Amino acid sequence: ALGSAINPAAISYRLKLLKDMGCDAIRTSHNIPSPELARQCDSLGFMLLVEPFDEWDIAKCDSGYHPYFNEWAENDVAQMVRVFRNHPSVVLWGIGNEIPNQLDNDGWRTVKRLQDVCHREDPTRPVTVCMDQVATVLTNDFARDIDIPGINYRTHKYYDAKATWTQGMILGSETASTVSSRGVYKFPVKMKLGATYDDHQSSGYDVEACPWSNVPDIDFELAER
C-alpha cells in the first residue's frame, strides 16, 4: 500500500474552525485516522471516536473491506487500539457502521469478538457499534453486549432503545442530515423528507432532510427533554 500524505497545518485549520463553531467531538467515520489528527485533538481538547471499517464480511460495495475481514479484522482492531490508546482525546472505540450483519441472528458473536479485542488491548474505554437497522436490533441480540450502542438517525427509536437495552446509555452516532441550497427558497415553507424539485435544488430554509434522517430541530428537542 502507498499510504497517504497529510498536511498538519490543514488539520489544525479544520479543527480550529470546528472548535470556533462549538464542536467538541469527532467521529473518524469510517476509517482509522492519521496519528496527527489524534495529536492535534489532544492539544485542542477534542473528544475522538476512532473506528476502523465500514463493513465486516458482508459486502456493502465491491471495493470494501469484506474480502479481508475474516483474516485481518482482529489484527487491525488490535493495531488500531495500540496506536491510539495513549491519546487522551480518544474516548470511544468503534467496531462497525451500519453493518449488514445487524440482520443476522448471529451478528452479536462478531460484536463480542471485536469488542473483546478492544477490551484486551485497552480495558479503560468503552466500545460502540453504530447501527441503522434499529427496529431489527431492538428485537434480536445484536446490540446486547455493546458497551454503548450507537444509533444512526432513527431518533423516534431512542425511547424504545432506552427501554429495551440494559446498558443505560445510547449514543447518537449519526444525527440530523439536512439538505439546502444557498440562496434558494421554496414556498410555502414546510418540513419535508426527500423532497425533489424540477430545478434540482433544495430550500435554503433548512427544513428539508434526507429520507433516512430528520432536521436538526428534532435532535435539539430531544436533547432538551
Predicted regions located by residue number:
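Active-site-adjacent substrate/metal-binding segments within catalytic domains
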Residues: 1-112, 123, 127-128
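Substrate-binding clefts and catalytic carboxylate motifs of secreted carbohydrate-active enzymes
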Residues: 91-93, 109-130, 141-143, 157-225
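Short hydrophobic/aromatic-enriched beta-strand-loop microsegments
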Residues: 45-52, 147-153, 169-175
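Short active-site oxyanion
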Residues: 24-26, 144-149
